[in-house]
Amino acid sequence: MILLISDLHLEEERPDITRAFLDLLHHRARGAQALYILGDFFEAWIGDDGMTPFQRSICAALRELSDSGTPIFIMHGNRDFLIGKAFCKAAGATLLKDPSVVQLHGEPVLLMHGDSLCTRDVGYMKLRRILRNPIVLFILRHLPLRTRHKLARKLRSESRAQTRMKANDIVDVTPEEVPRVMQQFGVRTLVHGHTHRPAIHKLQIGDQAAKRIVLGDWDKQGWALQVDEQGFQLAAFDFVNPQLALPGA
C-alpha cells in the first residue's frame, strides 16, 4: 500500500492539521510501502537554515517514520519550494523532482504538484518562472532570514488577494495541458495537488482510457490517496477522529 498526500499547509497556527498528520504517520503510513508528499507540505518555507522549533518537530516525526522502514518522497509546492537537501537528509526523505514518473504497483504514474498545469494564470506562471530560476533560488537562500520572512509574508498576502479576484477556471488546471503533459511522459495516470479540488477525472487520450487524480487540501478535513492491488482510492478523513477513512482502516 502506497499513500499520497499534498497541500497540508502545515503551520503552528493549525494544531488540528498537525495532529491529524502525526496520526497518519503513526498509523497508516507506518505500514506503507511509501509516502509521497506532493507539495505545499508547509504553509511557508524560507530555507532549511530558518527552521522553527515547530518545523523541526515535523522533521523529527518524518525521520521516525523513515527509520521504521517507510520511504518518504517530498515534492516542492508553490509555498515550500525552498525545501532543500539539508531538511530532506534530516527527515530521511528523498526530494522528488516536479514532474516525476514513478512506478506505483507496476503502473507508471506521473506525479506533479500541479501549479505548472495552470497555464491560463499568466501572472502566476510568470512569477513561478522567476522564482524557480536557479540564480534567483541561490539569491533567495542567501538573503538574511529576516528579509526572507518579510518576503514570504508579502508573497502569501498577494497570492491570497489575487486568487480571490481571479475566475475559478483561471486558477484551475488548463484542460488542454493535462493530456499534453501525459502524452509527453507516456502515462495514463496523473496525480497532482495544488488546486484544492479533490476528484478522480476520467479522460480519453487518443484511443486509451486515462485518469487525473487531484489530491485534496487539508483544511476542514484531510485527504489521502491509497494505491494498492485494488487500484487508486481517494478518501477524506475527519480531524476530530483522524483515523483515515480508507479501505482496511
UniProtKB/Swiss-Prot annotation:
Molecular function as annotated in GO: manganese ion binding; UDP-2,3-diacylglucosamine hydrolase activity
Lipid bilayer topology: Peripheral membrane protein
Pathway assigned to this chain's UniProt record: Glycolipid biosynthesis; lipid IV(A) biosynthesis; lipid IV(A) from (3R)-3-hydroxytetradecanoyl-[acyl-carrier-protein] and UDP-N-acetyl-alpha-D-glucosamine: step 4/6
CDD domains: MPP_YbbF-LpxH (cd07398)
Subcellular location: Cell inner membrane
Major localization class: membrane
Binding residues annotated for substrate, in chain numbering: N78, R79, D121, S159, T163, K166, H194
Sites where the protein binds Mn(2+) 2: D40, N78, H113, H194
Biological processes, Gene Ontology terms: lipid A biosynthetic process
Catalytic activities: UDP-2-N,3-O-bis[(3R)-3-hydroxytetradecanoyl]-alpha-D-glucosamine + H2O = 2-N,3-O-bis[(3R)-3-hydroxytetradecanoyl]-alpha-D-glucosaminyl 1-phosphate + UMP + 2 H(+)
Signal peptide residue numbers: none
Keywords: Cell inner membrane, Cell membrane, Hydrolase, Lipid A biosynthesis, Lipid biosynthesis, Lipid metabolism, Manganese, Membrane, Metal-binding
GO cellular component: cytoplasm; extrinsic component of plasma membrane
Pfam families named in the record: Metallophos
Binding site for Mn(2+) 1: D7, H9, D40, H196
Cofactor binding remark: Binds 2 Mn(2+) ions per subunit in a binuclear metal center.
Cross-referenced HAMAP family: LpxH
Record family assignment: Belongs to the LpxH family.
Protein role: Hydrolyzes the pyrophosphate bond of UDP-2,3-diacylglucosamine to yield 2,3-diacylglucosamine 1-phosphate (lipid X) and UMP by catalyzing the attack of water at the alpha-P atom. Involved in the biosynthesis of lipid A, a phosphorylated glycolipid that anchors the lipopolysaccharide to the outer membrane of the cell.
Full protein name: UDP-2,3-diacylglucosamine hydrolase
Organism: Pseudomonas fluorescens (strain SBW25)
Gene: lpxH
